[in-house]
Amino acid sequence: MKIGIIGAMEPEVAHLIAAMTNATSQTIAGIEFIAGTLAGKDVVVTRSGIGKVAASIATTLLIEKYAPDAVINTGSAGGFVDTLAIGDIVISSEVRHHDVDVTAFGYEIGQMAQQPAAFVPAAHLVEAANKAIAQLGEVKAIEGLICTGDSFICDPIRTQAMLKNFPTMAACEMEGAAIAQVCHQFGVPFVVIRSLSDNANNDSPVDFDSYIVKAGYHSALMVMLLLEQLNPSAIK
């Protein structure tokens, strides 16, 4: 069993890479892929870069070159749930694009043409994540809708517009749905796990800079605990 792990930024993958053993590195198209062992599993970790195009390129290369049995997207996100604090975690129940609109052709808001409206993570990955929650200590984790777009959301007016379109949205970020769409295309199971770095409001730029390391650590911890819970026989 081999697991691909993708984070957009250095703080989102640094703790994972530091915990790996037997690590080897290969750079393809300017993207570094680090293969090794983490939490007893064979993994390939990569820093994709920020945004949907960068994430799509990295995910495609990861799948084509390393053939992972599953892909985990880790990192930070803006939060939309009042009961969650900065550093808490959202496990994807589904992932959607929040900045796609081809409704003129009969699609749902957020649904790309010829794609599903929502990308649903693999049940065995979500199950492993939920089993790991008990080991997080004071960090809270929930399942919820994660939305993706090529914007850093810090405008309350835009936040309200997004919630009108996606009232159950728990978090937003800039890569997850792109990674999920590539995994869907290749038939590779995925899950998105995000720790909150901000609350998608006017304070978000300051909060993000202050808390990205904390969010990256919590998300990485969740990934490692998930890997420990993951049953190789569950991989499909």
UniProtKB/Swiss-Prot annotation:
Substrate binds at residues 78, 153, 174-175. Keywords: Amino-acid biosynthesis, Hydrolase, Methionine biosynthesis. Transmembrane segments: none annotated. GO terms for biological process: L-methionine salvage from methylthioadenosine; L-methionine salvage from S-adenosylmethionine; nucleoside catabolic process. The keyword RNA-binding does not apply. The keyword Transcription regulation does not apply. Pathway: Amino-acid biosynthesis; L-methionine biosynthesis via salvage pathway; S-methyl-5-thio-alpha-D-ribose 1-phosphate from S-methyl-5'-thioadenosine (hydrolase route): step 1/2. Coiled coil: none annotated. It is an enzyme of class 3 (hydrolase). It catalyses: S-adenosyl-L-homocysteine + H2O = S-(5-deoxy-D-ribos-5-yl)-L-homocysteine + adenine; S-methyl-5'-thioadenosine + H2O = 5-(methylsulfanyl)-D-ribose + adenine; 5'-deoxyadenosine + H2O = 5-deoxy-D-ribose + adenine. GO terms for cellular component: cytosol. The active site is at residues 12, 198. InterPro entries: MTA_SAH_Nsdase (IPR010049), Nucleoside_phosphorylase_d (IPR000845), Nucleoside_phosphorylase_sf (IPR035994). GO terms for molecular function: adenosylhomocysteine nucleosidase activity; methylthioadenosine nucleosidase activity. Its EC number is 3.2.2.9. Belongs to the PNP/UDP phosphorylase family. MtnN subfamily. Catalyzes the irreversible cleavage of the glycosidic bond in both 5'-methylthioadenosine (MTA) and S-adenosylhomocysteine (SAH/AdoHcy) to adenine and the corresponding thioribose, 5'-methylthioribose and S-ribosylhomocysteine, respectively. Also cleaves 5'-deoxyadenosine, a toxic by-product of radical S-adenosylmethionine (SAM) enzymes, into 5-deoxyribose and adenine. HAMAP family: Salvage_MtnN (MF_01684). This is 5'-methylthioadenosine/S-adenosylhomocysteine nucleosidase. It comes from Shewanella baltica (strain OS185).
